[in-house]
A protein has these predicted regions:
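Feature for soluble, non-membrane regions of globular proteins
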Residues: 2-181
């Protein structure tokens, strides 16, 4: 299988892009992201970035970056279970830069809510919260939240804060910690 994230990170692009395989069923993220939202977001929009890139349609850089970001986004989730708090290296990074998980969440929400229009918000490997306008490949992503309307409108309409708060419930911290190694 074409490992898109690794090839971008290592700077080696293949001739075709494929979506990452989900580690959960389309109905496996509970109320955080519905089956309907995933069918549309993962099944149509993310797929379209790969398909357009592979067909040479549209802006190749835009489609490539869109596919890359969605690969990171969809690969960081797991089914919701219990209290979902960070641990390991990511918790250390968060506490070094924000003092606590709760203060990190507040800072992340503030950065996300400040985005005018669409984009992405992420925790970077240097401990900063950063935003991406449009689509751009960034190699320092630890936690990534899609802030385009298609990400939250199906399940949350315009309630971006509820969307963000429910993202924390499905983050797979083992994957996030692996991004820091």
């Amino acid at each position: 299988m074409y490992n898109f994230i690794r090839q971008i990170t290592e700077g080696r692009l293949g001739k075709t892009l494929e979506r990452v395989k989900l580690a959960y069923p389309l109905d496996g993220l509970g109320k955080s992201l519905s089956k309907q939202a995933l069918e549309y977001h993962y099944g149509k929009l993310y797929k379209a970035y790969c398909d357009r890139y592979n067909a040479g349609e549209g802006d190749a850089d835009f489609n490539e970056a869109g596919a890359y970001l969605h690969s990171i986004y969809f690969s960081q989730f797991r089914a919701p279970k219990g209290s979902n708090k960070p641990d390991g290296s990511v918790l250390t990074l968060i506490e070094e830069h924000f003092k606590s998980w709760e203060k990190f969440q507040e800072a992340f929400e503030k950065a996300a809510m400040a985005i005018q229009g669409s984009g992405w918000v992420y925790l970077a490997k240097d401990g900063e919260i950063k935003t991406i306008k449009n689509h751009q490949i960034k190699k320092d992503i630890v936690i990534l939240v899609d802030w385009w309307e298609h990400s939250f409108c199906i399940d949350y309409q315009a309630d971006k804060k509820a969307y963000l708060n429910n993202q924390w419930k499905i983050i797979d911290w083992s994957i996030i910690n692996a991004r820091l190694t």
